[in-house]
Amino acid sequence: MWQLLLPTALLLLVSAGMRAEDLPKAVVFLEPQWYRVLEKDSVTLKCQGAYSPEDNSTRWFHNESLISSQTSSYFIAAARVNNSGEYRCQTSLSTLSDPVQLEVHIGWLLLQAPRWVFKEEDSIHLRCHSWKNTLLHKVTYLQNGKGRKYFHQNSDFYIPKATLKDSGSYFCRGLIGSKNVSSETVNITITQDLAVSSISSFFPPGYQVSFCLVMVLLFAVDTGLYFSVKKSIPSSTSDWKDHKFKWSKDPQDK
């Protein structure tokens, strides 16, 4: 059902001679950016897509079922577990968006991040979120069971440039009043750039710079040879054309 285009969009497509696959795809954004939230949190989903002058409505889908909302923003005032699932949107001049996942959890604490898979040197932003934003203090972020960062008052934890050593299981804990509470554990994965990885596997770290320099020098020499040969070809051709041959009979043919 959600795969059907808006009736108005169909008319516009026919009149303009366009096909559905020619339209841009709509995009769903979360505000705030966290796709894992606690019950009672407020969540706003925004749809970015093209609209026709005649139809500025938006179609929202939750787990492939049409939602009654027709505005560009879909607001959840107090999230519940049954709000979890995939959300998509579509406008009159855009195709159905890719799904965005929303997870609603029950608990005192939740470790949040925009995503759980990062590349080397990406920045990582972690947030230890308490239910209904209850005051939280003496907060510790832990990696693989060991304390990674401590804050007397609750604060977000930033890793400016991720390395492979930052991969692992993470959770946070702290005090709400005198009650010691912890979040569920989540796994963070840091991936290595394939190009860097392939060079590193061939050469030890001490030789990688030398290898790059050799490649640059080989390229420079190869380029110089190319232009040198290219420059000499026209003159050689010209000399060949200007050269005159004289034929003489062999003495015995006389």
Swiss-Prot record:
Post-translational changes noted in the entry: Glycosylated. Glycosylation plays an inhibitory role in the interaction with IgG1 and IgG2. Undergoes rapid ectodomain shedding upon NK cell stimulation. The soluble form is produced by a proteolytic cleavage mediated by ADAM17. Repeated stimulation causes receptor shedding, a mechanism that allows for increased NK cell motility and detachment from opsonized target cells while avoiding activation-induced NK cell apoptosis.
SMART domains: IG (SM00409)
Site annotation Cleavage: residues: A195, V196
Transmembrane segments: 207-229
Major localization class: membrane
Domain of life: Eukaryota
Glycan-bearing residues: N187
Function per UniProt: Receptor for the invariable Fc fragment of immunoglobulin gamma (IgG). Optimally activated upon binding of clustered antigen-IgG complexes displayed on cell surfaces, triggers lysis of antibody-coated cells, a process known as antibody-dependent cellular cytotoxicity (ADCC). Does not bind free monomeric IgG, thus avoiding inappropriate effector cell activation in the absence of antigenic trigger. Mediates IgG effector functions on natural killer (NK) cells.
Subunit text: Forms a heterooligomeric complex with ITAM-containing signaling subunits, either a homodimer of CD247, a homodimer of FCER1G or a heterodimer of CD247 and FCER1G, to form a functional receptor complex. Interacts (via transmembrane domain) with signaling subunits; this interaction is a prerequisite for receptor complex expression on the cell surface and intracellular signal transduction. Binds the Fc region of antigen-complexed IgG with a preference for IgG1 and IgG3 isotypes. Interacts with CD2; this interaction is involved in NK cell activation and cytotoxicity.
Protein name, as recorded: Low affinity immunoglobulin gamma Fc region receptor III-A
Organism: Papio anubis (Olive baboon)
